Amino acid sequence: MWSSRWRLWRRLLRYDANSKASQAFEPVQGVIAERVTYGTEFGMRVPAIVYRPRTYTGKLPALIVVNGHGGDKYSWYSFYSGILYARGGGVVLTYDPIGEGERNSERKSGTRAHDKLIPPPEMARRMSGLIINDVMQAVSYLSQRPEVDPSRIGAMGYSMGSFVLSLACAVETRLRAGWWR
């Protein structure tokens, strides 16, 4: 029973990411960073940054950085992870979780961004699904990039991002590694 629900959930949450690139910049020598968005549940767009080496050969491994409460794609650890792993020859995607960065419609700061009222019976089911779907769609987006080897995509989570990643790893079989702290 649970395995059939799990397979159905994975199938329903996986669809074309309809990604759009916006602008690229070079934060440090040898690393290119692109501001991109990718699609997720209910037509929402997820703002993200993709870091990659300026020059490379062949397909590269990729890493998704999952941020926690009060963290977004510009957090120091997201930036540092992007630079570090891109310099090491990988592709890194870090994004704004729901309620953070560009997805903080009420412009609250820190964890107060999550104080939006959602009816209690629906909150856990809706929010956890949306948050996990952001990770799953990040995998879909990276799998479509020409420089990424889809068989070598992993993820790391910080703080609340580590909890989100542990749930995503349970349902997203395309993630080859998960690391949380």
Question: Residue locations for each model-derived region?
Answer:
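N-terminal pre-domain segments of enzymes
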Residues: 1-17
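N-terminal cap/lid segment of alpha/beta-hydrolase-fold proteins
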Residues: 16-58
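Short alpha-helical segments and helix-capping/turn motifs at coil-helix boundaries
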Residues: 33, 76-80, 163
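Glycine-rich His-Gly loop
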Residues: 40-42, 65-70, 159
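Short, flexible micro-motifs
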Residues: 46, 71, 102-104, 160, ...
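Cap/lid segment of the alpha/beta-hydrolase catalytic domain
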Residues: 58-59, 64-144
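Primarily recognizes the serine-hydrolase "nucleophile elbow" in alpha/beta-hydrolase
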Residues: 88, 137-181
